[in-house]
Amino acid sequence: MEHIAQILAVIVTGTLVGVEFGVAAFTNPIVERLPDDAYWQARATGGRILGTVMPFWYITAAALMVGVAVLGHTPAAIAAVLVMGVVMVLTLTTLVPINNRVVAWAGAGGEAPSRELAHRWDRLHWLRVVLLSASFVGVALA
């Protein structure tokens, strides 16, 4: 059971890290080159779609990590769970509110948020990618 939980945790967390890295390294830089209206529409659409899917992915990854930590009692697994907790707090307290402002603007019209707001999200997202990578390493080493 422990091995199955660890394999699933590595797969789910690894793909999560890959998607988040892809958004940070490829998608957002491509979107950055668009004119303002297209830029905000792309950011809002991406935020809406990923904002719907990612909570389930994060919860699944965290639950699997907790399972690995409970079953294995290894320091690496416990560290992975703690780092994932930090990721989730960062996400819920800073990244989600910024994302919600971008998504809300696209539906309401009016003056667009500044690109600096999106750049702040991008910087915080890179921090999240680094933390997720550390969590992935922890669960992989458990």
Residue ranges and their predicted role:
Residues 2-9, 13-60, 98, 103-119:
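Interfacial loop at the N-terminal end of multi-pass membrane proteins
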Residues 54-69, 128-137:
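Core segments of transmembrane alpha-helices
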Residues 88-94:
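Mid-bilayer segments of alpha-helical transmembrane spans in multi-pass integral membrane proteins
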Residues 95, 99-100, 125:
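Asparagine-centered polar/low-complexity signal
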